[in-house]
């Protein structure tokens, strides 16, 4: 028995000796109900001590139990102090103060000091420091409570006497509409809040000085923090610009860029949205500082012979329109005749696969207002060919759609400088010829006219088909790119060839090879098996070519 005693270990829960305490602890029935919330933290401590001591007796076990009973009130006090700290953090402190809470703990025999330092963001000048000393609470300790310290600190920093209790509800009532406008960013102030009591700390009662501090923090403007006027003026409400706003007027539509308060022109600048029509070509439109620019859009569509129009209302403050700083909404109602009508949307005469071409027309009054006596240059884009022409034309000039091309013609609402037009014209006229080789792969150009989803045979390669009629050449520049440097879609365009005697044999050779290649390509695309075979064969040849070039047969020699 004497040899078996040192091997026995007493379970700290059921107080029974076991040879293998580790195997008993998971199955101990007294472990669950006997453990309280305070013993959860140190439940492994008695087991560890029991394992270290090989011969524990019942006296030692009882002594440990007494120590645990003595430690229980200390743990309860610590838990209450931690709860008190969180209660102080969750109590209704000034909601404008946001920042980091620095917790410094200095433990002593009878004192546990937690220091909360609330630092306000950017504009919040007064710093509030709360020091809490946990001692046995008594009425005498209320004289040095954090509430009194808070009142003293704020009164010293402000240098003004504390307002009466009757002023606090008025300040709160003045703050509440400001809080409602801020999308409920800050919760509304409750003047009669329930007091939240804790150990040695009272912060739930309504403090007029704290209400004043909250009002002072909310008086700081949020929009203009760096301006020198922010300190002198009162509450400045942030007026976010309304990006899209529907107006139930006769014109109807969306007013873009109209602010909620049109009278305040110093702090708001509205940028006009050009609907993606002129941003890519004309760059950014100039925005004047003291100018409210509203842009309305009205789209009325009808079928048949009725007009398809899209009117863009442009309201400006300037010498031409002379609104003189009025509301842009009323300016839109006053002058509806300043709309530019984009109409005369027609289909091309030919039956080819080309998109509709919107042409721009306007009335003489609109020309006199927006353009003056000069004409605004219209930018004409010819998609699918090298002949991108930039011609200064007037509003009255009709644009005719040509076969095989998609003509998109706009008119600029804002005048384009002549240097920009000349620069683009110089770039397009002096464009270098395209690289030889890409014309053998027409599938790389999905925007070319004539390349559809369904495979079809290419048109015959004849010189007669290349010569266009004379009316289509009027007012257009002839491309100087040689025939052999163009793609397959360009070679089928309606432009006469600039042939020379030196390039004639090469042209015939490349024309024959190109014709055979396109025909072979279209026939292979019809059959899926043949296309896959050609694809894998091409990849295999490329891989073999690369391996022979880079490895240089060193691997095969080994």
Curated annotation (Swiss-Prot):
Sorted UniProt keywords: Membrane, Mitochondrion, Mitochondrion inner membrane, Mitochondrion nucleoid, Transmembrane, Transmembrane helix
Principal location class: mitochondrion
Domain of life: Eukaryota
Record topological domains on the Extracellular side: 1-527
Region Disordered: start-end pairs: 29-88, 130-205, 222-269
Transmembrane intervals: 528-548
Membrane topology: Single-pass type I membrane protein
GO terms for biological process, alphabetical: cell population proliferation; mitochondrial DNA metabolic process; positive regulation of mitochondrial DNA replication
Recorded coiled-coil stretches: none
Regions of compositional bias (Basic and acidic residues) in chain numbering: 51-81
Localization: Mitochondrion inner membrane; Mitochondrion matrix, Mitochondrion nucleoid
KW Mitochondrion (keyword) present: yes
Protein role: Critical regulator of mitochondrial DNA (mtDNA) abundance. Binds dsDNA throughout the mitochondrial genome without sequence specificity and controls mtDNA copy number by promoting its replication. Also plays important roles in mitochondrial metabolism and cell proliferation.
Protein name (database record): Mitochondrial nucleoid-associated protein 1
Source organism per UniProt: Mus musculus (Mouse)
Lineage: Eukaryota, Metazoa, Chordata, Craniata, Vertebrata
Chain's gene name: Mtnap1
